[in-house]
């Protein structure tokens, strides 16, 4: 089954020069134990945290740190990533090992992790601006 990554690029309004990075960001370790999204997900989690922290400081410049921390925690979590991933139907782009080659439902954790990995893959494209495509922001 061939995956149309161009349709994902269109959804997030971002064109990847390095398609291999995009493919790796959407590859689960069950499909490829060596080139998968785990390290890119690690980066994506940090990028997401930094972008959200920066945005919260812009929106609430006078707010106390404790309140900002609560707002941050409500935004940077697996459920938020899952909601974003569902909004762009990210599961349809994720490669997982499927021994029977049948359509299967991908676990929510894999979808959420893939969203963080996608954010990690976006970082090299937009790191000078520390922004994410609007579709990925809640």
Residue ranges and their predicted role:
Residues 1-130:
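RNase III-family endoribonuclease catalytic core
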Residues 129-138:
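Single conserved hydrophobic/aromatic residue that forms the stacking wall/gate
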């Amino acid at each position: 089954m061939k995956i149309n990554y161009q349709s994902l690029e269109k959804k997030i309004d971002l064109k990847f020069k390095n398609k291999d990075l995009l493919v790796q960001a959407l590859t689960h370790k069950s499909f490829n134990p060596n080139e998968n999204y785990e390290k890119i997900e690690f980066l994506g989690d940090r990028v997401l945290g930094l972008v959200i922290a920066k945005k919260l400081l812009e929106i609430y410049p006078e707010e106390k740190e404790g309140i900002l921390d609560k707002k941050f925690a409500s935004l940077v979590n697996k459920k938020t990533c899952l909601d974003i991933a569902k909004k762009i139907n990210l599961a349809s782009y994720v490669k997982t090992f499927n021994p029977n080659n049948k359509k299967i439902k991908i676990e929510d954790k894999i979808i959420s992790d893939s969203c963080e990995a996608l954010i990690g893959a976006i970082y090299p494209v937009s790191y000078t601006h520390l922004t994410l495509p609007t579709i990925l922001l809640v």
